[in-house]
Amino acid sequence: MLSVAARSGPFAPVLSATSRGVAXXXXXXXXXXXXXTPQPPVLDPKRPILSRESLSGQAARRPLVATVGLNVPASVRYSHTDIKVPDFSDYRRSEVLDTTKSSRESSDARKGFSYLVTATTAVGVTYAAKSIVTQFVSSMSASADVLAMSKIEIKLSDIPEGKNMAFKWRGKPLFVRHRTQKEIEQEAAVELSQLRDPQHDLDRVKKPEWMILIGVCTHLGCVPIANAGDFGGYYCPCHGSHYDASGRIRKGPAPLNLEVPTYEFTSDDLVIVG
């Protein structure tokens, strides 16, 4: 028997071989046994090198073309199947969901519904704004006690004929004059062309014998003196304005007649001013 041993070099740790020679007439048989070895370790895969040659295959080979038009369908890229393309179907009305159907048939109905909603909303907003403005304005108005003080009752029997009495009303002097028949006829005969602020005597009174005026001069706010002046009515001592028995400016710097307040005769002997 012949034994041969050979060095396997760097593979010695993992390989082992035996060869034997037998002198006989039969054919020589050689048996080789390989010991079981573990799997070699897996190395990191080779990363591709980013170069012009490696990237040229991924670029487009033909020019890119974009098509724009009213009837051109929108392009959808299906590279990712997990992305849902929005079509806004949930926000569209049922009449216009079908893209192949014309929307002109349902145009009138849709417009009518929109107009109805808009008109209803406008009416509601207007009513709400009216209520808010009304409450705001009413909050600024005078209270009941202030309104009660804004009126004054005057007993006419206390004022003799030909006399003028002064009262305090809303912080201003109030003149109530009981005119004689001569004063009534004299003031009614005055021509409007002679007046700076033309106004007939009958337009300033409700009863000719009673003349009710606010005693504030229309020039600078002084208080005139009754039964004085060149015309027997009122005279302002501040700057010399003369008024007649109807409270009309006749001479001096005052531009307007004396103001006539709002009043009402509740009886023959009682008048309420305010």
UniProtKB/Swiss-Prot annotation:
The gene is UQCRFS1. Residues 141-274 are mitochondrial intermembrane. The Rieske protein is a high potential 2Fe-2S protein. Belongs to the Rieske iron-sulfur protein family. Disulfide bonds join 222-238. Proteolytic processing is necessary for the correct insertion of UQCRFS1 in the complex III dimer. Several fragments are generated during UQCRFS1 insertion, most probably due to the endogenous matrix-processing peptidase (MPP) activity of the 2 core protein subunits UQCRC1/QCR1 and UQCRC2/QCR2, which are homologous to the 2 mitochondrial-processing peptidase (MPP) subunits beta-MPP and alpha-MPP respectively. The action of the protease is also necessary for the clearance of the UQCRFS1 fragments. Keywords: 2Fe-2S, Disulfide bond, Electron transport, Iron, Iron-sulfur, Membrane, Metal-binding, Mitochondrion, Mitochondrion inner membrane, Respiratory chain, Transit peptide, Translocase, Transmembrane, Transmembrane helix, Transport. Its main location: mitochondrion. Binds 1 [2Fe-2S] cluster per subunit. Fe-S cluster delivery to the Rieske protein is mediated by components of the iron sulfur (Fe-S) cluster assembly machinery that reside in the mitochondrial matrix (including HSC20 and LYRM7). One of its GO terms (cellular component) is mitochondrial inner membrane. Its cofactor is [2Fe-2S] cluster. InterPro entries: bc1_Rieske_TM_sf (IPR037008), Globular_prot_asu/bsu (IPR011070), Rieske_2Fe-2S (IPR017941), Rieske_2Fe-2S_sf (IPR036922), Rieske_Fe-S_prot (IPR014349), Rieske_Fe-S_prot_C (IPR005805), Rieske_TM (IPR004192), Ubiquinol_cyt_c_Rdtase_Fe-S-su (IPR006317). [2Fe-2S] cluster binds at residues 217, 219, 236, 239, 241. It comes from Aotus azarae (Azara's night monkey). Its EC number is 7.1.1.8. It holds the Pfam family UCR_TM. It catalyses: a quinol + 2 Fe(III)-[cytochrome c](out) = a quinone + 2 Fe(II)-[cytochrome c](out) + 2 H(+)(out). It is a single-pass membrane protein. This is Cytochrome b-c1 complex subunit Rieske, mitochondrial. GO terms for molecular function: 2 iron, 2 sulfur cluster binding; metal ion binding; ubiquinol-cytochrome-c reductase activity.
